[in-house]
Every structure is written in structure tokens, then in C-alpha cells.
């Protein structure tokens, strides 16, 4: 909290002091060199008594940006007080004469013109308070007549105005042209500055440590042991921690809120340039049906390998291209593809990355594969169809690959092949039986019986295809 002290005895403005929430009133008194016998502390039109010296400032309602006023303790009229009163009267008369002179020299249109009230600094206006006047005063500043109605709001505004009159240093903190003349006129001060003061005070009174409305805070604190109140308090505390984390992240690591470009490389298939998406989270390398037709590989799709690609959603596998030459930079390498009806031309999956011992070097922004190095494409060259629709991005489940908009099945529009488990089995039919000799021969290669039977099911009993499947 930041506390400013206005000492009306010495006409000084101290602070603001940056204090912890657990500082006691006694420690605060010692900090400002407070004399209990001669002075009194006031905050929000309430005197801070010495009996509360063990309480913290927060318990006494002093939070955020606050002002504490030090006033002299009133004693019986003495010669000294009479002298001070005469000096104050002379000072007020002099100020009034000066204001009148300024008013005479100022055109009528400018006499009541003041800078916008919103310019009152937040550091001063939210919590500037003072003591209650010794007797009710009228808006004009004199004793109240019997038919005058003095509201607490009027008292608050008038007390603030008098604090500025008694503390020129405090008034100098308000960057309004002609403020010294403004505080001489109680009616004009109330009209222009009053609404801002009342609004700031209402904001301060509504604030609390839970960051919620004061009415809800009072309701929660009136019965904190109630299970529903405890749940709400816990929710508010958690929300405060979340907001704090958000603010820290935005201040110290704003880069985490930026979008990340996906990894694409250039390659060629049968002389056709292709932008391939590199996804180490995808189990298999995938080609779209459109690209298969463009590159002349559509006729080589083995539809016996039909199946379902399962991830966040699912999509239909059209078939498989067992081998095709792919050119990356100057290197030709054989590659196999799973063919899906998707809007992404080519996805370079983990099977090919592991096969050629690829290295995704994010520091150098390159892909090292098959003994060559190829750079990842800049953002401007990344296919635009990869970008998700903003409205869909908020509702779709997260996907680690771009295969989110598949046409094979309605569910496949949200499917992510990056986490997909590709089920290459053909549609369910009667359970097949395989030659025991083929099963034993494949098991001798180091695979379990279940893996061998699954591979034979995928290849429709072809032992050679099953062996190729097992070694992928």
C-alpha cells in the first residue's frame, strides 16, 4: 500500500510511503514521528484512536492509495489560539482578495473555465480525506443556516477543499490551471471536483482483498465456514493467482502468446514440387489423394491397406503407396505413404524420420536427413490452408498435426494425425486363419505371435507384405 501523510500542524506533505500490509498503527506512528499528546490521526473522516495501536493498517481500512491527515488536538481557547485564528483569517482575506483581483482581470467566459476534472491525479484524489469539521458548514464555507441540508457527501467535499486550502503543497500536486482560485470557491469546487472525489471514494470503498464487489465480500466474510462460501472464496483466490500468472507472463515472457510457425520443407515427387509438413508426432508418412493423382502415384495405391486413422477424430485410409522416389535438395530417397483424403499434401511422419535418422535442428532451423541439410520454410511460404479458422480454433480439440479438416468422415474435421494410431486393417470380415508355417517363419524374425497375426491380417495372408509391415 502507498500512504501519504498530510500534516496540518506543520503544513507538510509526507510520502507517499510504500508500506507492507502487516504494519501496525504503532509502527506507523513511529515512522511519521507522531505526538499523541498534541496530535490526532484521521482517515476517511474517522479518527484513529491510540487503543487501536496494535491493529494493522489494513484492519483499520487503510489500503491501496490512502491519505492520513495529522491534525492538532483542540484545546481551550488561549491567547495563542486567538493569534493563530487572526493569522488564518488574515491569510484567508488575502487569498480572497487575490481571487477577486484575478476574477476582475479574467473575462467572464474564462472565469469558470477549468481543465477537465478527469485530470485530477489518481494518486491524490482516490483517498484524500480529512477530519470532520468542528461544526456543520454550509456549501459557501460559513456556518450552516437552520434550513441548510448538509449531506455527508457535501461534508466530505468541503473537508477535502479545506485540506487543500491548509496545505499548499498538497494543492500543488493537482495539475489543474487555476486550482488555487478554484479551491477558494466552494460552490465551483463542489460542482467540478466533487463528482470525481465521490466516485474515487466509492471505488476505494468497493475494493477489497478478494477483488470482488463489496456486497459479495461482506456476504462471504459474514459466514466463511459455509461450504458454498468456502467454494466461492477458493474460486476467487484461484482466480487471483491465475490473473497474477497472466500478468507476469505478459510482462516477462510475452513471446508465449505469439503463434508458432509449423515446420515445412521443400521436396519433389516425380518432378512435382511439394511442401511437406514435418511432424515427428505422426506415426506414419501421409499423402493426400489429390497429391497422389497429381504426381502419378494414384495408380500405385494399394487399396488392400484400407483402414481408419484414429486420433482426436478419425478418417478413412484410402490405401498405401509402398515405394516412391522423393527428392530432398539433391538427394533421392525411397519413401512409402499412407494415402488419406486430406487437405494437406504431404506429412513427413516418424516412420521416415527414424528410417533416415533425421535431426530436427531448431537452433539452425534446418532438417538434417539422409546426409543432407534442408532449411525449414519461412512463414510466408507456408501453405495458407494450414491456418485454422479463428472460431473453430476456440472450440476444436487441440491437434498436433495439420490433418484436422478431413472429408472422409464428419468426425475427421477435428482429427489430428499427429497423435493418430493408424489402424491399417481392412474392414471387419470373418476371422482369417493363416498357414502355421508362415506364422512360425515370421515369429523366427523376433516378433510375437500377436504381432505376426496382426501383420498377416493387414496383408490378407501375404507373408512378404506382412514381413515388410513388421519391419516398419
From Swiss-Prot:
Q: What is this protein called?
A: DNA damage-inducible protein 1
Top-rank taxon, per record: Eukaryota
**The UBA domain covers which part of the protein?**
434-472
Q: Is Hydrolase among the key words of this record?
A: yes
Q: List, alphabetically, the Pfam families matched.
A: Asp_protease, UBA
Matching entries from Gene3D superfamilies are given as: Acid Proteases, DNA helicase RuvA subunit, C-terminal domain, Phosphatidylinositol 3-kinase Catalytic Subunit, Chain A, domain 1
Q: What is its EC number?
A: 3.4.23.-
Subunit info here reads: Binds ubiquitin and polyubiquitinated proteins.
Biased-composition ranges, Polar residues, are 393-404
Tell me the GO BP annotations in alphabetical order. Answer: positive regulation of DNA replication; protein secretion; protein transport to vacuole involved in ubiquitin-dependent protein catabolic process via the multivesicular body sorting pathway
Please give the Gene Ontology molecular function terms for this protein.
aspartic-type endopeptidase activity; polyubiquitin modification-dependent protein binding; proteasome regulatory particle binding; protein-macromolecule adaptor activity; SNARE binding; ubiquitin binding
Lineage, uppermost ranks: Eukaryota, Fungi, Dikarya, Ascomycota, Saccharomycotina
The chain positions of domain Ubiquitin-like read 1-72
Q: Where along the chain is the active site annotated?
A: 279
Any keyword GTP-binding?
no
Q: What class of enzyme is it?
A: hydrolase
Q: Its function?
A: Probable aspartic protease. May be involved in the regulation of exocytosis. Acts as a linker between the 19S proteasome and polyubiquitinated proteins via UBA domain interactions with ubiquitin for their subsequent degradation. Required for S-phase checkpoint control.
Q: Where is this region: Disordered?
A: 388-410
What is the protein's major site of localization? cytoplasm
Mark the transmembrane ranges.
none
Localization terms from the record: Cytoplasm
Q: Which GO terms describe its cellular component?
A: cytoplasm; plasma membrane
Q: Which UniProt keywords apply?
A: Aspartyl protease, Cytoplasm, Hydrolase, Protease, Protein transport, Transport
Family to which the UniProt record says this protein belongs = Belongs to the DDI1 family.
PANTHER family linked to this entry: ASPARTYL PROTEASE DDI-RELATED, AT13091P
